[in-house]
Regions:
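Conserved N-terminal phosphate-binding loop of PLP-dependent enzymes in the Aspartate aminotransferase
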Residues: 1-442
Length: 442
């Protein structure tokens, strides 16, 4: 591994020129976090246009699961491009789509047959799940969670509640969506303790929501991330998801799991819900499914997938090249990368927790597998989020050649490609340590 190697001031002259061109022609809606202008990437390394090499611990927001340009994924893409690039799976048939659907139906937890609808992204998978849940149940209402991120298309945005700015001036959003607190023990909204709270964040649904706002017989689905992603890499208490599943089954409500960021080996299991033995009615997937090719999927129990032909569609969803990439990706995941995520993720979490003992500003280190968050908080005992400190440390890490991304109010996420090894972990933690120390001294 050559990275990191920083040869120029960041951004370098070539990067500055491209950034200036970008400002003139691209929409300002893009929320770029630091001035990285990529030339090429391989494995764990990203090279910018000025020849600087970075160690990648963000994987394009947990997308490059097999590393950048894995040769087996590239070969699968090349072989499919020689056959055909596009036909439209909504109107015709091709084997890569069928083979991938068969594989996804096998991988998603739960007994019985499943049906797959292919999309281009996570947000589209959520949109499809909203429609299917309402169609199947003939109910309108949906429950989602504070801190949730399900996408920014209008339907998905109605479920998203990780940042008010995401929703500002886009109303009215779709009606009959109710948000309740997520199971976030570190900053419990009820100021309770996990060992004595009775999991109030689930019980409140029946105690309050079903009593004052909506009857359970009107609720189509509960949409929940097994681990909140953009909300701050929040792992709920162990009783949380099983209690939600029990509540759904009690009232005939569909349990829809958003595994867009947590799925495909990221947490050391193929799907994060496996850590708690959950069997969802619908799973929304994307990101790590195809190593960077644009692909998403909604996988539902077959008895739920009752909508008729043309009830939903997608011109590009399930593109054959993307399906070929996904098949190669899943093969690599099953041949050791899921286990590697569990093994190396444990090392990474241990090393980051060691930093927590040295820096009081690190309030919490949490996560499963290679989905780990480091939360910066005030040191006065109130655990107030330290967003500014988090952002400064992220930028300092970038300047040292370590690529990280923020999430939540004050968290930095560590979500490297699943090919990461112990040596890359040691390098990343060393650079992160230096970034924290220098930032705190400034």
């Amino acid at each position: 591994m050559k990275a990191p190697q920083i040869k120029t001031q960041l951004p370098g002259p070539k990067a500055q020129a491209i950034i200036e061109r970008d400002r003139r022609v691209t929409a300002p809606a893009y929320g770029r976090v630091y001035p990285l202008v990529v030339k090429q990437a391989k494995g764990m390394e990203v090279e910018d246009v000025d020849g600087n090499l970075f160690l990648d611990f963000m994987a394009g927001i947990a997308v490059a699961s097999t590393g950048h340009a894995h040769p087996r994924v590239v070969r699968a893409i090349e072989e499919q491009t020689k056959k055909f690039l596009h036909i439209c799976g909504s109107d015709y048939y091709y084997e890569p789509m069928v083979e991938l659907a068969e594989k996804l139906a096998r991988l998603v937890p739960g007994d019985g047959a499943k049906k797959v609808f292919f999309t281009n992204s996570g947000a589209e998978s959520v949109e499809a799940a909203i429609k299917l849940a309402r169609y199947y149940t003939k109910r309108q209402h949906i429950i989602a969670f504070d801190g949730a991120f399900h996408g920014r298309t209008l339907g998905a945005l109605s479920l998203t509640a990780s940042r008010a700015s995401h929703r500002a001036h886009f109303g009215p959003l779709i009606p009959d969506v109710h948000h309740v607190p997520y199971g976030f023990c570190y900053r419990c909204p009820y100021q309770l303790k996990h060992d004595s709270c009775g999991i109030e964040c689930v019980r409140i649904i029946e105690k309050q929501l079903f009593r004052y706002e909506v009857q359970p017989e009107e609720v189509a689905a509960i949409f929940v991330e097994p681990i909140q992603g953009e909300g701050g890499y929040i792992v709920p208490p162990p009783e949380y998801l099983p209690m939600l599943q029990e509540l759904c089954r009690k009232h005939g409500i569909l349990l829809v799991l958003d595994e867009i960021q947590s799925g495909f080996g990221r947490t050391g299991k193929m799907f994060a819900c496996e850590h708690w033995g959950i069997e969802p009615d619908i799973v929304c997937a994307a990101k790590g499914i195809a190593s960077g090719m644009p692909l998403g999927a909604m996988i539902a129990r077959a008895e739920i997938s009752t909508w008729p032909p043309s009830a939903h569609g997608s011109t590009f969803g399930g593109n054959p090249v993307a399906c070929a990439a996904a098949l190669a990706t899943i093969e690599l995941l099953e041949q050791g990368l899921v286990e590697n995520a569990a093994k190396v993720g444990s090392v990474l979490k241990e090393r980051l927790s060691a930093l927590q003992s040295r820096y009081p500003a690190i309030g919490d280190v949490r996560g499963l597998g290679l989905m780990i968050g480091v939360d910066f908080a005030s040191t006065d005992g109130h655990r107030a989020p330290e967003r500014n400190l988090r952002d400064r440390i992220m930028l300092k890490s970038f300047e040292k050649g370590l690529l990280l991304l923020s999430c939540g109010e004050s968290t930095l996420r560590f979500c490297p490609p699943l090919i990461v090894g112990p040596s890359e972990v040691e390098t990343a933690v060393r650079l992160f340590d230096q970034a924290i120390e220098q930032t705190l001294r400034e």
